[in-house]
Amino acid sequence: VLTGGDAVSLRTDFVTLTGRVPISGIKTFGSWYSRYQDWTAADYKNVIANYRANGFPLDVLVIDTKWRAAEDGTGYDIAANNFPDMRGFLADAHKSGVLTIFNDHTHQSSNSALSPTELKWHTENLQKILAMGLDGWWYDRNWKYALKSPYSEITPSTLGKVIYSDILTDYAGNDRIFLMVNADWDRNGTIESDPSVIGHRYGIQWTGDITSEALQLREELTNMVDMTAVGA
């Protein structure tokens, strides 16, 4: 109706209205390894070595919450029992041609996500670990705690995307940032709601935990096509 049935014009108008999707670095379009494991640096080095030994490409290594020391899955203290030399581990991954990204759950706080205290805390800690050699962050919707959005029309999940994107951009300067985020509209492969009309502008959209089954992959591909059609 809006463009006389011209799908290309409709998408062009939508992007003009809501903003373009940033282009990630070329390696983020490659092969990823992402599983929830309580593993050590040695375990992850073995993953990289096994990929190489068997002739399979590996471009991105995703490390879930067990890189951090806190039992509640928050905070930025390194789990020294799993990663006694985090700088060395990240440097070794780079030598193997692999980018590394950490999962991040926000902490419990009564402050607005835009308060100076919260912004300072997130900025200093996210950038501190980037300075160790981390390539990017996965801003993961925390099921226990959530950022507090001061705007009723902007969800905590979407606001977090904006905050993390700005913090990473501030650190990266003119370089591309590496940010993965939760898709607002999806929970573990199941569509729950309409997408945020601005969420697509911030990071690689992650649709949740899935199993390694053909039908699950089919559902993910279907979701990707369906939601892309409406601008997610």
Predicted regions located by residue number:
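Catalytic-domain carbohydrate-binding cleft regions of carbohydrate-active enzymes
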Residues: V1-A232
